[in-house]
Amino acid sequence: MDEFHRCGKEDSFWQQCFLYPLFFQEDLYAISHDHYLDVSSSSRPMEHLSSNDQLSFLTVKRLIGQIRQQNHSIVLFVNCDPNPLADRKKSFYSESVLEALTLVLEVPFSIWSKSSVEGMNECKSFRSIHSIFPFLEDKFPHSNSILDARIPYSIHPEILVRTFRRWIRDAPSLHPLRSVLYDYRNSPENLQRSIIVVPRVNTRFFLFLLNYYVCECESILFSRLKRSSHSRSLSHGSFPQRTHFHRSIKHIIIFSRRNSLKSIWSLKDPKIHYVRYGERPIIAIKGADLLVKKCRYYLLIFRQFYFHLWSEPYRVCSHQLSKNCSSSPGYFLRVRMNPLLVRTKTLDELFIPVLITNEMDPIVPIVPIIGLLATEKFCDISGRPISKLSWTSLTDDDILDRFDQIWRNLFHYYSGSFDRDGLYRIKYILLLSCAKTLACKHKSTIRVVRKELGPELFKKSFSKEREFDSLPFSSKAAARSQRERIWHSDIPQINPLANSWQKIQDLKIENLFDQ
């Protein structure tokens, strides 16, 4: 991939206009063949890989010729088996050709995405979850409303192919992509599956589609923005995963659906801030309610105008930060008033005015966390700890280390909240679940386990938190923890928990609107 990327840097025009000959390079299929073996070896025994499954250029011609009738929508992210093409054709070469197709398409996309970041000197972009929380802490207190949007999950395959034509001039190179999309869409497995956010099908190919689709939506959206600021960010190699980033917007022009050249609203200096966590964008706005309604309407017609997608109204929700909470990313986000006493002394009198400032107050979702722990069999639905039976075959140290890792991840991720009392209820559940698991393993009771291990039970488990001053082991540390907010650098470890909880929240909203 790096070799192809270097060739593309030397001559980007050749890269954009003549991608099709890359499909007939033996090195390309050798790379995809090795990559497929590396991925499949972890899930499939090597004896299942037949030596007769060989790649040939005839396979490419077959794939190009299988353009199906374009009368359905393609579901990009569905919960189905990891290898839909292999399930349907039972062939080894289909996955290798799909890997080769991904390698070819990644080259111009990587060059285009990096050049767009370097050329847009007026955009401020960060692509890390570590920048999201400080951004929310800095920008949300100065906003009064937010728009909670959701990226649509389905798109017609032909529309997706035509969007590729905007930056790939070599039309024949898109024939294999069109064939793969229609072939995947017409498979019977995909017509009966529910739509989810995280792609599980051919991780490299569908992650590329996800990154491209999000990048295309945002590039068109932010092409309408003027007078913004820009900050360079680190590149992500040959495959840019645009997972988390935010942008600061100072000017936006809203265009009519019927005539894109006629502006119907001009929002000057509205102080709009855009942040995206995974596939969930959030727009913070400081302005009147009319401004919020205009931006919400713009987001709804934007997808219909450019991608011919009908967006349900509940996919773009508006909230007032002073009254309601927003659920992202893994927090209940709200803004609270923080009174400050300012002592002013003159020669004659002493004045103590009260200044009211806004402050972001992320709330730990205790009840959803307990529900997720109940799903993983650490407790029941009411929060009563139970033993983890699937771990009783492990050693005592492994059991303690696993519980310790769960608590450490939870404590790190939610350390940004001032109110951490609910976290110690989670700690209590994990401690008793750990003790019950050990008691079940040794066929004894919790009292016997605690008597035999003594203080070693609590020294081995949940000991990592002692390294942090924010934990209230003393009154001084407790007072300091109420004034300080610490975002730890390893918070991405808890992303699966935040994503699972976010899916539950999205499902509740969809069910509410379906009723």
Curated annotation (Swiss-Prot):
<keyword id="KW-0934">Plastid</keyword>
<dbReference type="InterPro" id="IPR024942">
    <property type="entry name" value="Maturase_MatK_N"/>
</dbReference>
<dbReference type="GO" id="GO:0006397">
    <property type="term" value="P:mRNA processing"/>
</dbReference>
<dbReference type="InterPro" id="IPR024937">
    <property type="entry name" value="Domain_X"/>
</dbReference>
<dbReference type="GO" id="GO:0009507">
    <property type="term" value="C:chloroplast"/>
</dbReference>
<keyword id="KW-0694">RNA-binding</keyword>
<keyword id="KW-0150">Chloroplast</keyword>
<dbReference type="GO" id="GO:0008033">
    <property type="term" value="P:tRNA processing"/>
</dbReference>
<dbReference type="Pfam" id="PF01348">
    <property type="entry name" value="Intron_maturas2"/>
</dbReference>
<comment type="similarity">
    <text>Belongs to the intron maturase 2 family. MatK subfamily.</text>
</comment>
<dbReference type="GO" id="GO:0003723">
    <property type="term" value="F:RNA binding"/>
</dbReference>
<dbReference type="GO" id="GO:0008380">
    <property type="term" value="P:RNA splicing"/>
</dbReference>
<dbReference type="Pfam" id="PF01824">
    <property type="entry name" value="MatK_N"/>
</dbReference>
<keyword id="KW-0819">tRNA processing</keyword>
<dbReference type="InterPro" id="IPR002866">
    <property type="entry name" value="Maturase_MatK"/>
</dbReference>
<keyword id="KW-0507">mRNA processing</keyword>
<protein>
    <recommendedName>
        <fullName>Maturase K</fullName>
    </recommendedName>
</protein>
<comment type="function">
    <text>Usually encoded in the trnK tRNA gene intron. Probably assists in splicing its own and other chloroplast group II introns.</text>
</comment>
